[in-house]
């Protein structure tokens, strides 16, 4: 089983960089991603998550898995196989309710897997 090390600062930097990248995006998409990069993860909606590139969604899910239950930053070992299993479920849940809290949807799906 492959394990990966994440911490809050690394994940947030990655979210900001990837959310702001991509020169071929439409202007409205750039505005959406810029706004998203300014939000706390607890403020993200499923709509924000749905707007990410598919290849980046497992990284965001991995960060959520690594965040401790008290909401404080903590280094964590991540189960990559588990993330690959739960990411499609989170994507589907967010497609069903785009205005819902991404954090709450992710937590609900994570409880089913971890």
From Swiss-Prot:
Residues 1-26 form the signal peptide. Its main location: periplasm. It is found in: Periplasm. The keyword Transcription regulation does not apply. One of its GO terms (cellular component) is outer membrane-bounded periplasmic space. InterPro entries: HdeA (IPR024972), HdeA/HdeB_sf (IPR038303), HdeA_sf (IPR036831), HNS-dep_expression_A/B (IPR010486). Disulfide bonds join 46-94. Keywords: Chaperone, Disulfide bond, Periplasm, Signal. It comes from the Bacteria. GO terms for biological process: cellular stress response to acidic pH. Belongs to the HdeA family. Required for optimal acid stress protection. Exhibits a chaperone-like activity only at low pH by suppressing non-specifically the aggregation of denaturated periplasmic proteins. This is Probable acid stress chaperone HdeA. The lineage of its organism: Bacteria, Pseudomonadati, Pseudomonadota, Alphaproteobacteria, Hyphomicrobiales.
